[in-house]
Amino acid sequence: MDFQQLILNKERRWQRNLVIMSVVLVLLSTIHLMVGEVFLSPFQSLSVFEQKLLLDLRLPRLVAAAMIGAALAVSGATLQVLLGNVLAEPGVLGISGGASLAMVLVMFALPVLPTPMIFMLAAIAGSMLFTLILVGIARAMHLTTARLLLVGVALGILSSAIVTWAFYFSDDLSLRQLMYWLMGSIGGASWYQHTVTLVMLPVLVWLCCQGKPLDKLMLGEIHATQLGVDVHQMRWKLILAISVLVGCSVALGGIISFVGLVVPHLLRLAFGTENRYLLPLSAIFGAALLVFADIGARLLLDSAELPLGVMTTSIGAPIFIWMLVKSHDAR
C-alpha cells in the first residue's frame, strides 16, 4: 500500500467517524425531545399543550445543551494545542472565571434580581474583560505561551477567591441560586436567551475551520512561523474567539466542567491528532455528550433535576480514567 493510499484511508476513517457521531447526535436529540414527565411520541399527533411543551421548553433546552457542549469541546481542543498542554481547558486562562465573577457581581450589586439578558451580557463582558487583561499583560511583558498559561491560572484563582467571598456574605436565597448556577443548569433555557447563540454560531464555525493552522502550531512556534503562520496574530484571534464562546456558554448554562478537557483528549486517544478533523468532531462529540448528560439530569430523579455540571463530571471522569488505562496498556 503506497503513501497516498494510506492518507486516503486515514481521511475516510475520519469522515466515517464524523458521520457516526452525527447520527448519534441526531438520535440523542430525538430522545431528548421525547422523554420527560410527559412522553412525546413521534408517531402520533401532538395536542396544543404538547406542541407548546416541545417548541417552548424542550427544543430551546436541546439547542442550549448542544451549543454549550460544542463550544466548550472546541474551545478545549484549541487551547490544548495553543498552549501545548493536554490539561488546558477554557477555565485555565481565567476566561470561565471572569464570566462567573461578572455574573456573581451582577447578582449581588443590583437591587432586584437581574433578567436573563443582563446575566448573559455580564458573563460575556466578564470573559472579554479577563481576556483583554490577559492580552495586555502578555503584550507588555512579552510572555511566552507557558507564562501565558501561568497568568491565566492566576486570574482563575483570583476570580475563584472573589466568588468564595460572595458565598460567605450571601443570604440563603442568593446562596441557593448561586450554588445551583455554579453547578451548571439549562433548565431555564428559552428562545429569548438564544439571542446569544447567534453570536456563538459564527465564532464556533470559524474556530472549527482553523485546523490546518493549529496542525502547524503543534510543530512548535518556530516551525509554524516558517510554514507561514503568523503565530502572534493567530494566538490572539484564537483566544478572543474562545473567550466569546466560553462567555456565552457560561451565560446560557453556568459553569459546566470537564467537557473542554475530556472530549478532545478522548478523541485524540481514540482517533488521532489531525485538527482539521478533530475540531468538528469535538464539536459534535461535545454536543452529543451534553445532550446525553441533560437527558440523565432530567430522568434520574423523579421529583427533582440534577445539575448538569454534576452529570458531565460523573460521565466524563470514569471514561477519561478508562481511556488512560487503555492507552497505557496498549503501549
Curated annotation (Swiss-Prot):
It is found in: Cell inner membrane. This is Vitamin B12 import system permease protein BtuC. GO terms for molecular function: vitamin transmembrane transporter activity. It comes from Vibrio parahaemolyticus serotype O3:K6 (strain RIMD 2210633). Belongs to the binding-protein-dependent transport system permease family. FecCD subfamily. The chain crosses the membrane at residues 20-42, 62-84, 91-113, 118-140, 147-169, 189-208, 240-262, 277-299, 306-325. Part of the ABC transporter complex BtuCDF involved in vitamin B12 import. Involved in the translocation of the substrate across the membrane. It is a multi-pass membrane protein. The complex is composed of two ATP-binding proteins (BtuD), two transmembrane proteins (BtuC) and a solute-binding protein (BtuF). Signal peptide: none annotated. It comes from the Bacteria. GO terms for biological process: cobalamin transport. The keyword Membrane applies. GO terms for cellular component: plasma membrane. Keywords: Cell inner membrane, Cell membrane, Membrane, Transmembrane, Transmembrane helix, Transport.
